[in-house]
């Protein structure tokens, strides 16, 4: 079952305003970033708060309203990316896509309605006041995402066809003519990481087949036919 985005108001009673973690089950605080505003779906950006990144989830707590806060498990985050494109959003931010439970009977878009249903929110943007911290946040996101791998379905294990692989497992010799694959960063302002099967709105990596090897093969066939005649 997908947990999705949810309310979070559990704060410690020592006056620090920090969130209560599930330490008994091994949850640890990994990073704290102050002065981070949040925008849910297409709704207006909210007043700044503090972002707490734990080994299990993201927690955003408002600095203005002590009774307001949001949380989402890393297992529910299908994609996170650094966005600096002003056409995509007005401020540099961490963009996230959140998995939600599909409800065929509910055709309304809760992201744009007055009544906020957090369980239907599919996108969340985290906007730090200091945009130079985006890379640090992205690195922490990646680290915590690796701590929460998506459970492997039994059918996938039995089928033996796992087509997921990393760039480190591929030949990335872009300068060699005989390289089978050439991997180049797509010329966009987004750096992305996907934790699931969701498609990216913009291509993060561009895989290109080096067609030179086919041209060489055609030349060899042509030379062979010439010698035979």
From Swiss-Prot:
Task: Enumerate the InterPro entries for this protein.
Answer: ICln, ICln/Lot5/Saf5, PH-like_dom_sf
Q: From the Swiss-Prot or TrEMBL record, state where the protein is found.
A: Cytoplasm; Nucleus
Assembly notes:
Homooligomer.
GO BP annotations listed: cell volume homeostasis; chloride transport; spliceosomal snRNP assembly
Alphabetical keyword list = Cytoplasm, Nucleus
Q: Describe its function.
A: May participate in cellular volume control by activation of a swelling-induced chloride conductance pathway.
Q: Which family does it belong to?
A: Belongs to the pICln (TC 1.A.47) family.
A Pfam family this protein belongs to? Voldacs
- Known PANTHER family for this protein? CHLORIDE CONDUCTANCE REGULATORY PROTEIN ICLN, METHYLOSOME SUBUNIT PICLN
Source domain of life: Eukaryota
**Its GO CC terms?**
cytosol; methylosome; nucleus; pICln-Sm protein complex; plasma membrane
Record flagged with keyword Nucleus: yes
Protein name in the entry: Chloride conductance regulatory protein ICln
């Amino acid at each position: 079952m997908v947990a999705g985005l949810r309310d979070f108001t559990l704060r410690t009673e020592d006056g620090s305003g920090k969130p209560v973690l599930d330490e008994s089950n091994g949850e640890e605080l990994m990073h704290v970033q102050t002065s981070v505003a949040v925008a849910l779906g297409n709704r207006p950006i909210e007043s700044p708060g503090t972002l707490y990144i734990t080994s299990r989830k993201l927690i955003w707590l408002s600095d203005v309203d002590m009774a307001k806060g949001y949380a989402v498990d890393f297992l529910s985050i299908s994609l996170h990316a650094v966005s600096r494109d002003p056409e995509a959003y007005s401020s540099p931010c961490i963009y996230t896509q959140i998995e939600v439970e599909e409800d065929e009977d509910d055709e309304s878009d809760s992201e744009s309605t007055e009544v906020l249903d957090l369980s239907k929110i599919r996108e969340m943007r985290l906007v730090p006041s200091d945009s130079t911290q985006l890379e640090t946040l992205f690195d922490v996101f990646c680290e915590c995402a690796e701590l929460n791998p998506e459970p492997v379905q039994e059918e996938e294990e039995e089928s033996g066809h796992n087509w997921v692989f990393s760039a480190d497992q591929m030949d990335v010799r872009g300068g060699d003519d005989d390289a089978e694959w050439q991997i180049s960063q797509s010329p966009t302002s987004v750096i992305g990481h996907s934790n699931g099967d969701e498609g990216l709105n913009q291509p993060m990596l561009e895989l290109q087949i080096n067609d030179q090897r086919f041209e060489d093969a055609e030349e060899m066939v042509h030379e062979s036919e010439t010698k035979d005649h």
